[in-house]
């Protein structure tokens, strides 16, 4: 399912990161110019919710001490699978995020 999040310039400034909620999921958005990257903030180890730590530059899991870098790659703890990256597009200035029912 694809969600129209809003005007990309209103949702996220260039170079910024932001956590949003869609369909009960926490999503981390990251913008570099006209490219927006989105990750599902659910740990790939045990399904626990993740937190984005702006100061530390990591995405962390309180359940088992797992951590991911800002590219979604596991860097600490038990996770071995990268975060699920969600499809994003900018359509006439609107940010679109697609959430599927399975991890990819």
What are these regions (language model features)?
Residues 1-56, 82-104:
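N-terminal pre-ligand scaffold of iron-sulfur
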Residues 66-67, 91:
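Short amphipathic alpha-helical patches
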Residues 57-65, 75-84:
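Short cysteine/histidine-rich metal-coordination sites, predominantly Zn2+-binding motifs
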């Amino acid at each position: 399912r694809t969600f129209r999040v809003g005007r990309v310039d209103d949702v996220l400034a260039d170079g910024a990161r932001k956590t949003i909620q869609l369909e009960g999921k926490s999503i981390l958005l990251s913008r570099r110019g006209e490219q927006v990257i989105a990750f599902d903030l659910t740990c790939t180890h045990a399904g626990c919710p993740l937190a984005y730590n702006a100061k530390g530059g990591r995405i962390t899991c309180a359940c088992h001490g797992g951590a991911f870098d800002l590219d979604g790659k596991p860097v600490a703890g038990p996770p071995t699978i990268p975060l699920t990256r969600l499809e994003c597009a900018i359509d006439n200035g609107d940010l679109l995020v697609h959430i599927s029912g399975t991890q990819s």
